[in-house]
């Protein structure tokens, strides 16, 4: 029986943090045994906001190293860079011509990013969801792991695929969302009301996968809690709940077992143990990261691109012919 194909993309716009790992990458690693996976470094998406070319290039390779260190296996999955497959922007143009302005103007993420960077709003940022649709549809993807903030974009992708198939003939699979039950939203340590982010300015906001042990201890020690002093899984107590969620996801212990473990302990003891759990969980990733050479990264990317290009080419040629393009 043929495995279903999963497509996932990640931007090379900064250091990978614990939220990226628990919310997406750890899930991707677990998917490898069950599905055929394509993991794409979506560097073309990264230029929709200002970014230094040298930084973008170095971060692209650093991200590949970290994904490999986390457990993405080139023997099980295709790992490649978006800009090395020319059909991504080519198909995006075909899809651009099928989507109304009204549908695009309803995209909430464009509005949010425009407010944060009003001087840097460009057409690429507006068209971001169409390029994302192209990324997914090129590979006849069955499933797409998405967080809450990407659900609207996947819905647009589904609508675009259905409309194209209806207007021109069957071309695209209509992908389904694959949503992790837990871990999809890890919040900031210093502000548990916002999702952990690479771009947040707070020095103690995020734990990065390459943070030294003493840095991790310091960040967790300063993490927001409350004045109640009771360690329990209560979503209304955002700070404590966020830290407990991290502990649960890394330790694989049940909420009941964790609450029992810390029943008569204070936040100081809990944070100390949480820091140790985080440090021990990241240790093998950090060790593997140091072992990966630049040559290994390039070999993995070449192999991934060779796997991706024929799939993308076949879909693009079919879409092009159905639209009457020579």
UniProtKB/Swiss-Prot annotation:
Pfam families recorded: tRNA-synt_1b
PANTHER family xrefs: TRYPTOPHAN--TRNA LIGASE, MITOCHONDRIAL
GO biological process terms on file: tryptophanyl-tRNA aminoacylation
Originating organism: Helicobacter pylori (strain J99 / ATCC 700824)
Protein's recorded name: Tryptophan--tRNA ligase
Motif ('KMSKS' region): 195-199
Its job: Catalyzes the attachment of tryptophan to tRNA(Trp).
Keywords assigned by UniProt, alphabetized: Aminoacyl-tRNA synthetase, ATP-binding, Cytoplasm, Ligase, Nucleotide-binding, Protein biosynthesis
Residue ranges crossing the lipid bilayer per the database entry: none
UniProt GO molecular function: ATP binding; tryptophan-tRNA ligase activity
Residues binding L-tryptophan: 135
Family the entry assigns: Belongs to the class-I aminoacyl-tRNA synthetase family.
Cell compartments where the protein resides: Cytoplasm
Domain of life: Bacteria
Top-level class of the enzyme under EC nomenclature: ligase
Motif 'HIGH' region, residue range(s) on this chain: 12-20
One term under GO cellular component: cytosol
Binding site for ATP: 11-13, 19-20, 147-149, 186, 195-199
UniProt main location, coarse: cytoplasm
Enzyme Commission number(s) from the entry: 6.1.1.2
Subunit note: Homodimer.
Catalytic reaction annotation: tRNA(Trp) + L-tryptophan + ATP = L-tryptophyl-tRNA(Trp) + AMP + diphosphate + H(+)
């Amino acid at each position: 029986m043929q495995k279903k194909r999963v497509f996932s993309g990640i931007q090379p716009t900064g250091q990978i943090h614990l939220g990226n790992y628990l919310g997406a990458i750890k899930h991707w690693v677990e998917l490898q045994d069950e599905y055929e996976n394509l993991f794409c470094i979506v560097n073309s998406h990264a230029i929709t906001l200002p970014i230094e070319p040298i930084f973008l290039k170095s971060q692209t390779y650093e991200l590949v190293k970290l994904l490999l260190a986390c457990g993405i296996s080139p023997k099980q999955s295709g790992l490649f860079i978006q800009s090395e497959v020319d059909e991504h922007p080519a198909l995006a143009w075909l899809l651009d011509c099928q989507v109304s302005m009204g549908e695009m103007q309803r995209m909430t993420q464009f509005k949010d990013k425009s407010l944060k960077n009003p001087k840097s709003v460009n057409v690429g940022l507006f068209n971001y969801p169409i390029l994302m649709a192209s990324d997914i549809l090129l590979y006849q993807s069955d499933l797409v792991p998405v967080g809450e903030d990407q659900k609207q974009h996947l819905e647009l992708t589904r609508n675009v695929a259905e409309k194209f198939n209806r207007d021109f003939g069957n071309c695209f699979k209509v992908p389904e969302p694959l949503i992790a039950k837990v871990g999809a939203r890890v919040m900031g340590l210093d502000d548990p009301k916002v999702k952990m982010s690479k771009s947040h300015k707070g020095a103690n906001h995020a734990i990065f996968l390459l943070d030294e042990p003493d840095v991790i201890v310091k960040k967790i020690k300063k993490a927001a809690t409350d004045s109640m002093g009771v360690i329990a899984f209560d979503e209304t107590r955002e700070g404590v709940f966020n830290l407990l969620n991290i502990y649960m996801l890394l330790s694989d212990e049940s909420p009941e077992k964790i609450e029992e473990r810390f029943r008569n302990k204070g936040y100081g003891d809990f944070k100390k143990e949480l820091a140790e759990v985080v440090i021990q969980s990241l240790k093998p990733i950090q060790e593997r990261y140091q072992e990966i050479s630049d040559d290994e990264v390039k070999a993995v990317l070449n192999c991934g691109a060779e796997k991706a290009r024929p799939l993308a080419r076949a879909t693009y040629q079919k879409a092009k012919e159905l639209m009457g393009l020579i």
